[in-house]
């Protein structure tokens, strides 16, 4: 019996020819992850890695009425009967780690992560039961320019990887007083259309009415579109804060739109919420989002600290890059040594190790295929440079290097070809 993957998960694999599966190519993930590390370093964020599973109560702080907690988590009992949950989102785990390591004494804390998340959800385009998320969490500072800086980091990531037709959509939910006032207004409005709402929205009416604005059910859309905007109910102080963020985005030339119906799917968000959207082939969809969560850290038993962050689903981002033809697999340059007879094996073993220590990626074809077959395999496997080594090369100590992409050759002693290889690898485009 052939063993296959369970539904909703996938391999990231280095050998993929099927165009529909190309988004799973290892080199694409390396490229995007490299951009993440670079842009986060430029903004002064430090990488954090939390465990794949946590005690289940960690994720209850996401909100007991959120879809993540109610129906999307993978939970299990360990051998001592304790409930554990595979990480469904990053923020709660980062806050737990932040508090457990006593970092709250620092005035400013900036973290980023690239981690797998696990949600048992209905499969849809760009979403999987194991998916990968790039996220940032900035803890300790409440300032509109900090929020703008977080948005700038998100925008710079999208720009660096080459995504096009991007826009930031924003809304401002205000604090608890604003949401209390708006809750009454929204309930009064929705009561008039209660019978027309979807079953899910009717359920949310009694648990978290604000989440109805996040509904994707078709029958809810016109009702949501005509709902009173929460921005009409925020305080003057909140509105000033929001406008300072917008002013900063204009200065930074980051395109944005105010979306008065935007709320986020996790219950801990307050004040600023945002989504990054793209439009491709006349279809608009989100590639990431986040906001402020000033009450979450105190909910964990810590001090009342301000915080802002976002998450980006990498599967959908990479699929969009491919659809927009902004990325393609890259094969790093490497040299393949091909010993043509057993007497060349020892030479290849020793020289390959020396080349690696010089910084030249090198592998040896130990299969002892015939020359034609070995060269065909090297071409098929995207090898950049090839060196055939037989009796003549061992005696003369003159080596020929074939550039497989340019179909050119250069030759010389070991020392001469080593210098030429270093130059070629550094200066030949991938």
UniProtKB/Swiss-Prot annotation:
Keyword Aminoacyl-tRNA synthetase: yes
Cellular-component GO terms for this entry: cytoplasm
E.C. number(s) listed in UniProt: 6.1.1.21
Subcellular location: Cytoplasm
MF-aspect GO terms: ATP binding; histidine-tRNA ligase activity
Database matches in InterPro entries: aa-tRNA-synth_II (IPR006195), aa-tRNA-synth_II/BPL/LPL (IPR045864), Anticodon-bd (IPR004154), Anticodon-bd_dom_sf (IPR036621), His-tRNA-ligase (IPR015807), HisRS-like_core (IPR041715), HisRS/HisZ (IPR004516)
Any GO BP annotation: histidyl-tRNA aminoacylation
Enzyme class: ligase
Keywords noted in UniProt: Aminoacyl-tRNA synthetase, ATP-binding, Cytoplasm, Ligase, Nucleotide-binding, Protein biosynthesis
SUPFAM superfamilies membership: Class II aaRS ABD-related, Class II aaRS and biotin synthetases
Signal peptide location: none
Keyword DNA repair: no
Record text on subunit structure and interactions: Homodimer.
Protein name per the record: Histidine--tRNA ligase
Gene name of this polypeptide: hisS
